Amino acid sequence: MNNNNNNNNNSNNNNNSNNNNNGNSNNNFFSGKGNALSAYQNKILNIKSNNNNAHHFVNKNVPTYSPPNIIMANKKGGNFNNTSGNIINRYNVENNNHRNTYHPSNNNTRNSVNFLNKNILYGNNNNNNNNNNNINITNISNNNNNINITNISNNNNNINITNISNNNKQPISSNQHPYQQKQSHHHNNSINYNEYMDEKNMNTSQSIFKNMTIQRNSQQFNTSDFVNNINIMNAPHINEHSNIYKRNSLNIVNNAHIISNNMNIQSNRNSNISFPQNMNANIGGLKNSNHNLNNIEMKYNTLNNNMNSINKNTNITNVGTLNIQMKNNPMNVNINQNNYNTDFYVNENKVNSKNKENNNNHINIEKMNYIKSNVYLDNTLVQVNSNNNYNMDKNILNNNNNTYIINDKKNSTVNNNITNMDNNLVPGVMSSMNIPDDIKKRKKKERKKNENIYNNRNKSSINTEEHNNNIIDVANQNSEHFLQNNKQYGNITNIQNNNLSHDMNNYSINNSTTSDVIGIVELYKNSLSSKAVNKKKSKLIKDVIDDNKKRNKKEKKKTIPNNDSIINDMNKNKNVELLNETQIFDNKNYDKNNDIHNNIYNSNDNNLIHNKNNVNNDHTNIKEANNNNNRKSEHSEKNKDVHNYYYANNYQCITDEKNNKQYILWNNRTIEVTFVWLFITKEFNENRKKYTAFLPYLKHFYPNRLKDLIEQLEKYSLLKFNYIMHSSYNMQEEYNKNKEPNNINSNDNNNKNDDNNNNNNKNVDGNNNNNNNINSNDKEVLMNGMLLSDKSTLNSNKQIDNTLINNINSGFNNIIKNMSIDDNTIRSIMDNIENITKGKKKGRKKKQTLENNGDNIKEDIKSSKKDKKKDNINDNNNDNNNDNNNDNNNDNNNDNNNDNNNDNNNNNNNNNNNNNNNNNNNHNNHNDNKNNQGDSKNEQEKKKKTRQYRKKSKITNDDNNEKIKQDNINSNNPKNDLKNNEIICSEEKNMKEDNIPDDTHYKEKRRNTFNLFNLDEGTINMDLFNLSLLENDDALNKKENDMVSKSNIPSSFSSPPKETNNKNDIDKEQSDKHNNVQEFQNLNMNNEKSKDLYFNKNDIDNNDNKDKIINETSSGTFMQNLKETFYEKTKAMFSNLLSDTKISKDDELNNEVDQNCVKTSSGILNKEENNKKEDDEKHFDDNTNEQKKNVDNGEYNEMTAEPGRKKRKKDVLERKKKNLNKEIIKSEKRIRKYRTKKMLLKEAMEKGISNNIVESNITANNNNDNNKNNDNDNNNNNNDNIINNNNNNGDMFSNSYDNSYIKENKYNKKLCFPQNNLLSDFRSEPIIIQQDKRKIIKINTINKIKRKYKKFRFCINKVFKKKSINDIIALNENIHKNKDLLTLFKKKDLANLKKKNLSFFMDTLKLEKIDMLIMKRIQMCLEKIKNTLLLTCTINNVQEIVNILKKAFEKRLYLMWPLIEFSNKYRLDQYFHLLGKNKNHINSSFKDTKLFVHQNISSLILYFNQRSMDDKWVEYLKSQMKPKRRRRKTKMKEQFLEDKPIDYLNTMNSQHSNNFIGENFSEIETVESKANEYAFVGYNQKRLLTQITPYDYRVVLNSNFCNKFFTPNWREQQSIFIDNLHFDMVPDTDEIKKHFENVYIRYMEYDEEKLRSKSDTKSKEHKKKDKKYKMLFKKKEGKGKPGRKKKIKLEIENVSNEIKIKKPRKKYERVKPRKSKNAMMNEEKSGNSEKQINNVLNVTNIENKHKSKKGRKPKESNLNNLNINEDINVAKASPDTLHRASLEFMNPNLFT
């Protein structure tokens, strides 16, 4: 799709645009951003960015989502071969760095197109019209000035020039009409279209525009160009576009698509066009179209500059209208832009295959009849009426000889009724035609009368036989507005129902652009003077217009994203039932109606409401309004609350079971789903910023929810369905040309993976591994004519297969996870527990709050069930068993046909597939043959089923499915039709699914995880999220070890046969109860061990029980698996960790007395025998807990020892049984009595990392039966857990499991364990690691240190109650490195942490230096494999892997970098300053943003105020502690201890509550400035403001965003990596310090000049003041007091920096109060100088007001003024410097 555009300059005849389409080069016109142009389009559009500022145009005023105008006009039928890429109508140049100068063809045309980030519409440049003449060129002039979008239709009939000015600058002046300006006026910026249509090549027309100049702020055209030179209909033949547009002649499309950032659409000017007499025949139906058109003179008599602006809500107030004057015809009015805006693409209509009414087609056809050149034939044309339209296309294309394109055909329409315009819904724009309620309520007579008139008109104007396409909208009963002419009625039918709710008020339900509708109204108003129209009608129209105005006023507040609610309202109220509904169209391809193109295209797709509800009526059948309405109402009821996007009904999903592929039938084309994903991937990869909002969710769409994804893209105006399909089709065509027969399967697969990667890549590299690979391999994957080579050809081509790369990457991540001995176990499980319990609550709430509209859910459920069965197809038919086994199991998962599954010759696969199929049948059989309609019957069946299953267990799959389906409301029926397993995102495929046996439950679960995200809310159903993650982690774990398997390692790897044999053996034996045994676990052990530990032999041997199992669990598979994997593990852990095992033992004695009494006693009695073994394997506790330890040891044995295993044990048991029970009861009582939270925490700490926990996790899927027969020692650990788990399938924290009381259980949820890697991903399951003595030693040392330093425990309690990330990080850092334990919480360590300056690392990121690190890591991985799996692996192409990993890391890191920057706690404040106080500055980039940031520093002010008071108090007390010698003895002296301190304290404390009134009031400014500074730079660490450290990186890794987006393994690996990052800060040079000070001064709004002058004069002033100050105190103090003087001197030195602490007056110090002469002046002066930065308090210095209370110091006011003037906090800054400083702080490299 990306063309080698630069090569197209020379090729004038691009008949086969396909040839050029796939020369994918990064030189692409868009520089990798935006939608690629087809070769053809590149020829057509020569766009050069003349404006230097273009790339600086950061998305300032631009709405978040920009509508790409994607118009696909590719049709295979007829002469229309241009299948390839007319795709690019819009491109976002989002990178500042990309300035695209693009002039592929002979520099003839240069569009100065400045890219507003998201809003630029590059007109509909898909000129697939064989109608040669129209290319929509939207010239958007840059920056804020004017967006002049001139779409001038070649058709003489309409030249609508819309001038859009973004920043409200004046558009074209009214006196100078743009067409009358001459070419001499061209400016440098202007676009000169001097191209001629080559007359040789353009058979149809001579030259359309000779000279056209689009200027930045005005449009200049030569009138002659339009009037004289448009001979559109003369030519007998329309050749293909390449001939037509030879030399890139730019035909400017008629109606401008108006998009401006602010959605200010200014100007459909009112222009009067006078037409010759010939045109009056049929309004818009020009039967003699050739001749007439030649004679048409376009005279613009007036250009009324009614630039009517559209609000951001796209309410059009008054858009000027074309008054077209047709002589002899009073109803000139009816020829509105419809007739003349011939450019419109028939495109959108067809989007709905069912849409047989072609309102748009009619319009198009009409235009075709009289304006041949402008009709854009789209692919979709064929689809509108699969039969009729196709004929139309053929006729249009082939039968060009006829004067009328489809003159003799049924389909030809001569009808230019305005009703035909009404096909496009433009949401957000209020149609003036909306019928006010009062009109609706009119008397029956009037209404009937109107209806009769209307019906008559329809009869007269429609010849049903001849003009089948002449569908005149038969209006709804209540909404007929039509005007009567002597001869004809121009129909303006507003097909709204009475029910039009006020939500919908803004939306023109006529499918015409609102401007058109308003124009029509204006036209009608003009024609009202004709006597044919009576007063009532004029009043009616007037009412309509008034109502429109009112509604527009109301709707101003509405924001664009209300489309959903609007759509829902429309559907509920059946408001949007257009009779000739061609509503289902692409928002961006405003092809269907000229109208859409004509006047307004709102930069948000939201303007166009996509209605699935459109009933498709054949053109031939023109039914009465009632029939259509009925059908529509039915349909709308079916789809009631679904977000109806047009594409829903427009394609069919076809499954090719033989080839295991899935196809989409669209516009009579079959598109393989793979290519759809490929295209989406490419699009996302090229426009990451654009799709940023989607990033967290993409991977949840990936294999099965293509439809959901497209719908979401539609909904948020990011991509259009037609565009996607069209592009995908082109891609597929290109690929088919180049492909080799053996490449197909792998390419599809790889591409699918790539797609997903790219999806996730969008902004933050999505699924870690996937995105990395795609990014690194973009060229290979997407840009070569041949997509990635097949696996089988890997060796010969020496290409790295993308899947393999992903496997390598993910595999290494997983192994690294295994490798990191830092224990994630407890942490992860605790977090999971916490999240799951929380998540359940959240999930329930969400269930209620979601838009659970019944039909919607029905459809979702049906579609999801149905899709489980039908649509999941294996796209990879590699015969290689390993490949199938590993890569394709999941692809096959949900096929019900065993044939597909049998392709995989592995027994394991067959078994699992059978299970899956049975499950699917059982679960979904009632949905097999149903369509996407939500029948109540199905709903009832579903309810019945769910009820049944709910009875069986508390948590069942059906519950979850239901919840998930409800959560997945965004996935409507149609979405789920596209569910494909064939494309598996590489990460998911490799990490989650590849090696998992085909398991419907797993698949279902995985799908459910995709549905976890509610895009509307942007939230996750945490319940489902966590549950699914657990099992995904099983899959990941399996993947970790399977990474060694053949399919996952490139052929260049040599993998020893031992490994695969081991795997296959295990596979044969392995079939877990619910098909979810993890190969990972199996591979971790020897065959013996794995047999003993991991297999339920009954399940393996008794396949007879399979059906029974399936029937029992088919509804509950998801949750049951969860119970087995997660609950057992966590319960087992908690039994070891949190409750003294005696309690759980006691409970079990109660529950299973017979079995366990024997076991317990025998275990304890034989404790000594087993002690050694027990200690080695399990106990890391210290000697302090001996008694408990003994009980624990006994307990492990007691549970696991088998009765009758050793006779000696039985004998001992009988002897000692009584004693044992007594002992147990005693210890239990003791423990219960004294247990506290501290004890719980202590126990958790002490037992936290014991390998008991890790090993108990291994036993997740085991049952008692399994272990009874095994003598393996490992079972000693397991039975304990398993028995417990069997008893408790319910709540994890149920008291039946451990007797600990409820408080404890609540507390359990909160516990965190510092031994774990606290920052590692909490979702990851514990990793099974062989016993490691080093770990035991480490734990013991920690325990010793804990005992030694009580501070440690205290801090842990404190830290984890607070969950302060800083403390946790410090704790984590220190615990992982035992040497740091002694200085555990010293500030120095925190400082050291922060000194690891990651920003420095980023700047000097030399990836070569990382090579050694990665290689070392790989070596460790291999050792780990050897230790755990007993396999030796050799890697031959290490360098290749290193490069892959490096690229992956680099791209990820750079994607995460903005997050990391933002996470910097100092950096957050600078965003406040940028968005807060600097926002109103002249130069601010954020002036127009709606973001408001409020920094609440009131608490800081209070704090500093209190601190200053405390300082005073302390100072006072100090002075009291050293009594002073007094000059004279006084009887007035008061006792120090009695009154004074208390009084003083009271006064000080009261000041606080009185809003600082009192002595302290004068210091508010100082306090405030301190608070400000503190807020600006936390803890005054100015230097750190610009530093980003590994600490920030770690915080980001642990953020929700990364949790959703990156795999746990990768994040964990990164956290390990971070531990090794010790980049010390760059030392500060004088230059850096100086620079920083300058920036800081500007930032804090200090005036640099004043500060400089102050610093110059400072020393002199100080000397003066010092003298005065000393003298002052000498007077006070009297005779020599040397000590006192020294003290004063110290104070003086700091006088300008510190708060001056006023000591309280002594009563005996009498100072006469006298008024200061300068008091008033000082007040004013200080008041002006002390306005504070955040304007919390602007106070004058009232200090003097309070002087009289306590006397005065001589000259004190001057001292205060000195402080104020010299205090850096008080100084002022100029706004310019402030703004500059703010921007500088955005630069992370400031000091590195």
Swiss-Prot record:
Amino acid composition bias (Basic and acidic residues), ranges on this chain: 856-873, 955-966, 1060-1071, 1088-1106, 1166-1192
Known uses: Possible candidate for an effective malaria vaccine as determined by epitope response in sera.
A single cellular component GO annotation: nucleus
Low complexity: compositionally biased ranges: 1-28, 741-776, 874-924, 1045-1057, 1261-1289
Organism encoding this protein: Plasmodium falciparum (isolate 3D7)
Signal peptide: none
Name of the protein this chain belongs to: Uncharacterized protein MAL13P1.304
Biased composition (Basic residues): 550-559, 838-847, 943-954, 1205-1215, 1660-1686, 1704-1717
Polar residues bias: start-end ranges: 169-182
Top-rank taxon: Eukaryota
Annotated region (Disordered), positions in chain: 1-34, 162-187, 440-461, 544-568, 736-777, 837-979, 1044-1071, 1084-1106, 1160-1215, 1257-1290, 1651-1686, 1704-1731, 1742-1761
Assigned keywords, A-Z: Merozoite
Taxonomic path: Eukaryota, Sar, Alveolata, Apicomplexa, Aconoidasida
Keyword Lipid biosynthesis: no
Claim: Signal is one of the keywords in the record: no
